[in-house]
C-alpha cells in the first residue's frame, strides 16, 4: 500500500512530466533512442507465438469440453480469425466480441 509521501512523489513527478517543467531539452534527445528501442529487441516469432497461445486457450476451453456438444457452431464462430476478442467464461459458455 502506498503511503502519503509516495503518493505526493508520484503526483509531483507526473505533474512535472505532463507540464514539461524540470526537463532539459537534451534529456529527451538522449533518452529518445533508448525509449524507442525497448520493443525492438523482441523477436517477431515470440509475439506471434504469444498471440497463438492466447487463441489456443479459448479453443481448448470451448472445443474440448464435452458438456455442451450442441454449441460447437457457436464455439467455432468465436474462434474464427475475424473474431479476435474471445475468452473462457467461468460457466463454459462461448463469449466472443466482434
UniProtKB/Swiss-Prot annotation:
This is Defensin. Belongs to the invertebrate defensin family. Type 1 subfamily. Disulfide bonds join 61-88, 74-94, 78-96. Induction: By bacterial infection. The keyword Mitochondrion does not apply. One of its GO terms (biological process) is innate immune response. Keywords: Antibiotic, Antimicrobial, Defensin, Disulfide bond, Immunity, Innate immunity, Signal. It comes from Mamestra brassicae. Pfam families: Defensin_2. Gene3D superfamilies: Knottin, scorpion toxin-like (3.30.30.10). It comes from the Eukaryota. The keyword Transcription regulation does not apply.
